């Protein structure tokens, strides 16, 4: 069965093959991204919202992500001859009472910018907005450099992730205990 952005899949099956299919669904658009976030946190997540600083999406965030499942999501630049990238943050309320925030940036102009991404856990319930995006983008984000990165997120959780450097980017993240 084909993977579709806006759905969930078995966490163990998340990988570049599935995310490449998500990219393919976006069609012939440059500046696009397929995102997969594997929930190995021991709890469940409920979608709050996505905030696009630039670009848009054609799908909604999967509403509920149980433990050991992975959410699939995507973003793209606006259609037409516009100089935009796919730049956003999205948020999930976690069953531990905190919020998982994810930020990605696939810029239009690679002469000035690079692919960037980050993950952060916020205390309590918090929707994604410009402030959340800026907190992660201007904090200490990871470059989309085709390399794996990991960090302790606090609250007993850690993350490991990778983002490609391409204009058709893939971002794969695993949240675990």
From Swiss-Prot:
UniProt-annotated location(s): Secreted; Nematocyst; Target cell membrane
Keyword Transport included in the entry's annotation: yes
Coiled-coil segments on the chain, per record: none
Domain of life the protein comes from: Eukaryota
Chain intervals for the UniProt region annotation (N-terminal region): 11-30
Main location class: secreted
Record-annotated disulphide pairs: none
Keyword Secreted: yes
UniProt keyword annotations, A-Z: Cytolysis, Ion transport, Membrane, Nematocyst, Secreted, Target cell membrane, Target membrane, Toxin, Transmembrane, Transport
Cleaved signal peptide residues: none
Chain positions recorded as phosphocholine binding sites: 54, 87, 105, 107, 133, 137-138
Biological process terms in GO annotation: cytolysis in another organism; monoatomic cation transport; pore complex assembly
Ranges for region Plays an important role in the hemolytic activity: 3-12
Annotated site, Important in the initial contact with the lipid membrane, chain positions: 113
Region (Trp-rich region, which is important for the binding to lipid membrane): 105-120
Additional detail: Hemolytic activity is 3.6 x 10(4) HU/mg.
Subunit-structure text: Octamer or nonamer in membranes. Monomer in the soluble state.
Described purpose of this protein according to its UniProt entry: Pore-forming protein that forms cations-selective hydrophilic pores of around 1 nm and causes cardiac stimulation and cytolysis. Pore formation is a multi-step process that involves specific recognition of membrane sphingomyelin (but neither cholesterol nor phosphatidylcholine) using aromatic rich region and adjacent phosphocholine (POC) binding site, firm binding to the membrane (mainly driven by hydrophobic interactions) accompanied by the transfer of the N-terminal region to the lipid-water interface and finally pore formation after oligomerization of monomers.
Notes concerning its domains: Composed of a long N-terminal alpha-helix and a core region rich in beta-sheet structures. Before the pore formation, the alpha-helix binds the lipid membrane, partitions into the lipid-water interface and stabilizes the monomeric molecule on the membrane. Finally, it traverses the bilayer, thus forming the transmembrane pore.
Family in the record: Belongs to the actinoporin family. Sea anemone subfamily.
Protein name stated in the entry: DELTA-stichotoxin-Hcr4b
Biological source species: Radianthus crispa
């Amino acid at each position: 069965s084909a993977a579709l952005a806006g759905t969930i899949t078995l966490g163990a099956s998340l990988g570049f093959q599935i995310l490449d299919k998500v990219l393919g669904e976006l069609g012939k658009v440059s500046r696009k991204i397929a995102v997969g976030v594997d929930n190995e946190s021991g709890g469940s997540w409920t979608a709050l919202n996505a905030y696009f600083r630039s670009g848009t999406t054609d799908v909604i965030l999967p509403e509920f992500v149980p433990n050991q499942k992975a959410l699939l999501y995507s973003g793209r630049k606006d259609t037409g001859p516009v100089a935009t990238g796919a730049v956003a943050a999205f948020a999930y309320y976690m069953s531990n009472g905190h919020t998982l925030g994810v930020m990605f940036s696939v810029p239009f102009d690679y002469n000035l910018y690079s692919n960037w991404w980050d993950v952060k856990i916020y205390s309590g319930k918090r929707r994604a907005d410009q402030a959340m995006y800026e907190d992660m983008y201007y904090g200490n984000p990871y470059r989309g450099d085709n390399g794996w990165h990991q960090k302790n997120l606090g609250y007993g959780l850690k993350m490991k992730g990778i983002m490609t450097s391409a204009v058709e980017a893939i971002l794969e993240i695993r949240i675990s205990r």
